[in-house]
């Protein structure tokens, strides 16, 4: 047991982009931050920008690519002359099934125990393999819930920031104007910070809207742009 005075303030990892205005300064350690949106909205670009910012000063990160879309060229473009140094600070995991994803996350704890310089875990995306899993939907949802509970425990116990990207869908009983993040209440429950990413008419502009935050009111939004060096 500890007293309130023993609890330290949250540590933030800046994204050095306009997203920091929504996030209160950056990605928070000790919790899960979720970015969700349609294909092509910029979720992976956000993830890679965060990856670069988390590792450029010598800290390490784990990047889990579940979609097979990790682009070395894009990371090089974002990192520029820092690529050589940050490449040594990034662990890459590429599970090919939901079972492999769960196993990899279980094994991440061993990595965190051995390497105390890891500050960030990014999963892009959290649901790609979950969506194609065969079996009883209720049981698969339970497994997703256990996976998320494991991630939250790791974030708190090892004081790492966890970022997940998520996809969207339109419920069958709604019109196309209503979209929901996949994973429903499971991902919403375990994600303490949630940001929706939307495309704009201008293909270079995106809108990020705060849907959930530990200390800030939802509904705030900012515009950002995808550029060679990530996002601004």
From Swiss-Prot:
GO terms for molecular function: ATP binding; ATP hydrolysis activity; ATP-dependent DNA damage sensor activity; damaged DNA binding; single-stranded DNA binding. GO terms for biological process: DNA recombination; DNA repair. It comes from the Archaea. The keyword DNA damage applies. The keyword Cell cycle does not apply. Pfam families: Rad51. Keywords: ATP-binding, DNA damage, DNA recombination, DNA-binding, Nucleotide-binding. Involved in DNA repair and in homologous recombination. May regulate the cleavage reactions of the branch-structured DNA. Has a very weak ATPase activity that is not stimulated by DNA. Binds DNA but does not promote DNA strands exchange. Belongs to the eukaryotic RecA-like protein family. RadB subfamily. NCBIfam families: recomb_radB. This is DNA repair and recombination protein RadB. It comes from Methanosphaera stadtmanae (strain ATCC 43021 / DSM 3091 / JCM 11832 / MCB-3). The gene is radB.
């Amino acid at each position: 047991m500890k007293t309130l005075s023993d609890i330290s303030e949250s540590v933030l990892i800046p994204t050095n982009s306009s997203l920091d205005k929504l996030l209160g300064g950056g990605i928070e350690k000790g919790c899960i931050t979720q970015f969700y949106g349609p294909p092509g909205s910029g979720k992976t670009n956000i993830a890679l920008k965060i990856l670069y910012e988390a590792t450029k000063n010598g800290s390490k990160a784990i990047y889990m690519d579940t979609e097979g879309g990790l682009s070395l060229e894009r990371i090089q473009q974002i990192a520029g002359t820092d690529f050589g140094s940050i490449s040594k600070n990034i662990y890459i995991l590429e599970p090919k099934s939901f079972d492999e994803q769960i196993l990899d996350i279980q094994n991440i704890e061993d990595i965190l125990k051995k390497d105390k310089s890891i500050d960030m875990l990014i999963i892009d995306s959290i649901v790609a393999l979950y969506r194609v899993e065969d079996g009883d939907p209720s049981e698969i949802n339970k497994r997703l819930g256990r996976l998320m509970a494991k991630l939250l425990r790791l974030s708190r116990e090892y004081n790492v920031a966890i970022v997940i990207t998520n996809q969207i869908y339109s419920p069958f009983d709604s019109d196309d104007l209503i979209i929901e993040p996949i994973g429903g209440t499971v991902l919403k429950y375990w994600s303490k910070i949630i940001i929706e990413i939307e495309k704009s008419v201008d293909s270079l502009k995106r809108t990020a809207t705060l849907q959930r935050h530990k200390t800030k009111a939802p509904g705030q939004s900012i515009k950002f742009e995808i550029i060679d060096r990530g996002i601004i």
